[in-house]
Amino acid sequence: MTEFQGKIELDIRDSEPDWGPYAAPTAPENSPNVLYLVWDDTGIATWDCFGGLVEMPAMTRVAERGVRLTQFHTTALCSPTRASLLTGRNATTVGMATIEEFTDGFPNCNGRIPADTALLSEVLNERGYNTYCVGKWHLTPLEECSMASTKRHWPTSRGFERFYGFMGGETDQWYPDLVYDNHPVNPPGTPEDGYHLSKDIADKTIEFIRDAKVIVPDKPWFSYVCPGAGHAPHHVFKEWADKYAGKFDMGYERYREIALEKQKSMGLVPPDTELSPINPYLDVKGPQGEPWPLQDTVRPWDSLNDEEKRLFSRMAEVFAGFLSYTDAQIGRILDYLEESGQLDNTIIVVISDNGASGEGGPNGSVNEGKFFNGYIDTVEESMKLFDHLGGPETYNHYPIGWAMAFNTPYKLYKRYASHEGGIADSAIISWPNGIAAHGEVRDNYVNVSDITPTVYDLMNVTPPETVKGIPQNPLDGVSFKAALADPAADTGKTTQFYTMLGTRGIWHDGWFANTVHAATPAGWSHFDQDRWEVYHIAKDRSQCHDLAGEQPEKLEELKALWFSEAAKYNGLPLADLNLMETLTRFRPYLVGERNSYVYYPDCADVGIGAAAEIRGRSFAVLADVTVDTTGAEGVLFKQGGAHGGHVLFIQDGRLHYVYNFLGERQQLVSSAGPIPLGRHLLGVRYERKGTVANSHTPLGDLTLYFDHNPVG
């Protein structure tokens, strides 16, 4: 704030005002708008403008007006990439070494971006920009996502004036868990009405920009737009999936060959780039003799029977339709910007947050939640829902073979920061008024932490020394503005270190060293026993030729550099916890370790970070209910939904309880007779008796009660 320059006398009539210290900040004239568009779980060989077979006309439109980055890299996972993108720093620097659900209370991994590493939204808001966040957030700890929690890490507390979207890493695209600014809301429609979250996100993006433009037409804005696509569930209208009928019947291995040829012809990879093996580490054992995870293993296409091929192809068709439908919605945003005369003066940055996801496992899934519970889908179970893939009945994900294909020509998948399949991603940057290059490619090595420093550079903005009065730490990223003007320009970037879920990598001057370590939830640990590889990645993009035996000095140099960079950027401790270790670690939940919860009708939904924790333990649910009619019905208590959870409800005058195991099996217990009219205490009690053999799945007895009397 500037000092008051007016004059103060006894009488206001003799005084001179000065509004300067109190005026809102104003952006410089002709400041560009900024649009960050972040896709989810979309491998580099997915879109047609990057050599894939999925038609993305809106993305092609941006690419034709800008530059595609052929060596753009992320962190291998969503929350860390988004934190790095918005701050211009390494994810570990800002406490986001992994996703919010896995944070563990260390400086590198606490899930809370510190105030001394401001987001682009905070910087631009202080420079007179309107700021909007629409879609996926995933930068708030689980324990801070409830109506009772602090909102200090919600979008509206981190520089965004308006927010509409979902707080977590994924949501149902038909029935999303939505938040508007700082309170939950219901979707404005249903699938039967034509509702889909991708359309809703585009609608809100246009609405937010338009709302301000009608008042101050020249005020610039920053919009951070993050659709759910292509993260599971792959939900889309059937007609969009049907556009791809038969187009993936060649299988994922043939897709790789087609995509690589296209990438070469488009100048996206060197002409001598090779395809990596489909299962490069199938014979690798963990430090205690553990096999390579089955969930991270591709089934060769030729080994599939006709029914499996039909199922796997349809899952890819649904995914492709999901992306193309969402691309069409993004196209509507571009249309609005063009029609309103804003497009040419808008810096557009498009990225995917990590490589294609292998979380569908070897057989794909009709319910992605099974992956996170250690279950692999069977083809027989999935075929029962074949005609419903992409619809509300499924929470679907394609088989890991398609992840390999969509990451062509690279090894491995999302979660693996050790390999290009996890970290090499699509990226486009466009600004017709400021970047002369149109339809070109750049081969410079770029990391997601370099994006915001480059945008600052394009805007001639010096990163502020303080934001909201808080002194700022320096940016970690390096601007590549010079390379946008001249492909031969040296950006000055020499090193980039990686760590994710127990995997490690380090890039330095065209060389890349990495560990061979199965990612979470493998739980291998023993990081001191990791095997390392080294590649001359400037000449071997797909990590096909390990030179560790030929270049031992180079390997030792890069290993030492990894530890040096880790010390600089909070790279330790390493974590590859298995599911049970993750679930049983302490987290500072606001509700504490309570044994009793009271819920009331008509209150906001309670999320997983604040709800009663009933997993793996005995519990009881009691409801104070007045039944005033025969044949009464209604839900008394529900956790979860159609794809996993439990519910206590009244139907046809009787009390019922359903336990839904991952959408696959439902266990129903019903009262023997109807509930008498009047006020009653209705309930269910579960007593744990043990676990299923060779698993952590609990077993127990369940009883229904009327007024403490067992009835079922």
What are the roles of these predicted feature ranges?
Residues 1-528, 532, 541-560, 596-604, ...:
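Formylglycine-dependent sulfatase
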Residues 178, 506, 648, 704-705:
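Short aromatic-centered micro-motifs
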Residues 182, 510, 663, 704-708:
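Residue-level detection of beta-strand-connecting loop/turn positions
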Residues 226-231, 583-593:
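Core structural elements
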Residues 504, 512, 653-656, 702:
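Hydrophobic residues embedded in beta-strands of well-ordered beta-sheets
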Residues 589-656:
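Extracellular glycan-recognition modules
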Residues 661-681, 690-691:
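Short, aromatic/His-centered strand-loop micro-motif at the edge of beta-sheets
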Residues 677, 681-712:
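Carbohydrate-binding surfaces in secreted/extracellular proteins
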